[in-house]
Amino acid sequence: EVHTKKEVTFKNFINELLVFADKEYLGEVFYNLIDNSIKYSSNSVHIEIFSYRVEKGVNIRVKDNGIGISKEDQQIIFDKFERASASKRTFSKGGAPGFGLGLNYVLHVIEAHGGMVSVDSELGKYTEFTIFLPDQSDSYEGRRRIR
């Protein structure tokens, strides 16, 4: 319901890159990030997706023009059941819907693939998540199984 009256614009700067990953889990990761971009933005949402090769892997960035995340909240948003303060009060008195599980799931999936996820944001301006996924040639010993 939160998304029904929003105008969403996507720009993609996606290069075709090969990564060793589970496409179903990665699909859920990007669904979650894009859904959050829409949920925590005004009525006119602009989302940019970038992908590019870096040393020993690939970076994928998802950036929006949403409400932003404070520096303090950036420290906790990947923890289970934690939500950014601004997200709780964005829509009506009850805030935007959510349980604080989505970004914890994103982190879990990316780390299980041997990667990393980070956030850069400025309140009232933007949020940008960067995901690093390692090259297929890197060793996968010790990686966690996704449950």
Language-model regions, residue ranges each:
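Short beta-strand/loop element within the Bergerat-fold HATPase_c
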Residues: 44-56
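Acidic ATP/Mg2+-coordinating residue in the GHKL
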Residues: 64
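Short helix-loop "hinge" at the ATP-lid/N-box region of the Bergerat-fold HATPase_c
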Residues: 37-38
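Conserved micro-motifs of the catalytic ATP-binding
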Residues: 14, 18-21
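Short conserved segments within the C-terminal catalytic ATPase subdomain
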Residues: 1-11
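Short conserved segment of the HATPase_c
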Residues: 69-86, 144-145
